[in-house]
Regions:
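C-terminal catalytic core of tyrosine-transesterase DNA break-rejoin enzymes
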Residues: 20, 97, 101, 108, ...
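N-terminal core-binding DNA-recognition domain of tyrosine site-specific recombinases/integrases
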Residues: 1-34, 170-175, 195-201
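Conserved tyrosine-mediated DNA breakage-rejoining catalytic core shared by Y-recombinases
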Residues: 102, 111-154, 235
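Basic, Lys/Arg- and aromatic-enriched nucleic-acid-binding interface segment
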Residues: 19, 23-28, 38, 58-106, ...
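Hydrophobic recognition helices of helix-based DNA-binding modules
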Residues: 32-36, 155-157, 210
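Active-site/catalytic core of tyrosine-dependent DNA strand-transfer enzymes
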Residues: 146-194, 200-201, 205-206, 213-214
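Catalytic-site neighborhood detector that most strongly recognizes the C-terminal catalytic loop/helix
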Residues: 74, 133, 226-264
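Short, charged phosphate-coordinating catalytic segments
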Residues: 34-52, 95-123, 218-224
Length: 265
């Protein structure tokens, strides 16, 4: 089995699959072997004993197989100006503006419904991502997203803000990403080697702009704004119990409003 696992990893690498995908394959094989170890017994012998007494794949490393994950890069200021100077449909401009000013994930924004657009008692407009199915399996992505003053929404309507196709998992990121990249993001790349600039880059842009604020907001505040995994002093259960008390919407609003977006003018 260890030899077979390595051969499988080699074959998947030859097909151009990423290391993370190959790890998923091995994880599935691990699960199958562990199930067999725990549930399948040789009943032709006395006493009955398991066919497999240990997982022979446990120590097989596939860290050197497959393409390593490539991280996306934030757009340069020139590219941001170029992007928002392009002629585009109103809904496309709205979505790109939401991404660069809030740091939301593409799927979070592409799946927005008008009933998620709300105002708090202080008149702060926000997207309510605290309820319903999450696009990321992370409880901390459930949050309230404060909208800065530079983000203007059209007149409130009903249904979805955007109309991208849903995949089998009920997500829109694949269709939205393909469309926005081909129509806009690819056009602002410097050359063919500048291939890490995609629509997801706008989330990186907002993260970088937030971190460059003076004074710099705490990492916990930044995490609550963008919905990243939380790594502060509180445990997950403590954070869940105190959700909406950890960081007030007005704090998020004040922070995102400090970020300047001259490319939107």
């Amino acid at each position: 089995l260890p030899v077979h696992a390595v051969k499988i990893a080699q074959e998947l690498e030859n097909r151009g699959l990423a290391n993370a995908t190959i790890k998923n394959y091995k994880s599935a094989l691990d699960g199958l072997v562990v199930f067999a170890k725990n549930n399948l017994n040789n009943e032709t012998v006395t006493p009955v004993r398991p066919w497999i007494v240990a997982n022979p794949l446990a120590d097989v490393s596939i860290s050197n197989y497959g393409a390593k994950k490539r991280s996306w890069e934030a757009l340069t200021e020139d590219q941001l100006h170029h992007l928002f100077s392009l002629l585009m449909l109103g809904k496309d401009r709205l979505l790109l503006t939401i991404l660069v000013t809030t740091g939301m994930r593409l799927d979070e924004a592409a799946l927005l419904q008008w009933d998620q657009v709300k105002k708090d008692k202080n008149g702060i407009t926000y997207f309510d991502l605290s309820m319903g199915a999450l696009v990321k399996n992370d409880k901390f992505s459930a949050r309230l997203v404060a909208l800065p003053d530079c983000l203007s929404l059209p007149k409130k309507a009903t249904g979805k803000l955007f109309n991208f196709k849903l995949d089998d998992d009920g997500k829109s990121a694949k269709d939205a990403s393909r469309y926005l990249n081909e129509k806009y993001l690819h056009r602002v790349r410097f050359d063919k080697n500048d291939d890490r600039k995609v629509v997801h880059s706008l989330r990186h842009n907002l993260s970088g702009l937030l971190q460059n604020l003076v004074p710099t907001p705490s990492s916990e505040h930044l995490d609550w704004i963008t919905g990243h995994d939380m790594e502060g002093a509180k445990t997950a259960s403590e954070r869940k119990r105190t959700y909406n008390q950890d960081i007030d919407l007005s704090i998020k609003y004040e922070i995102v409003n400090r970020v300047k977006h001259p490319w939107l003018k």
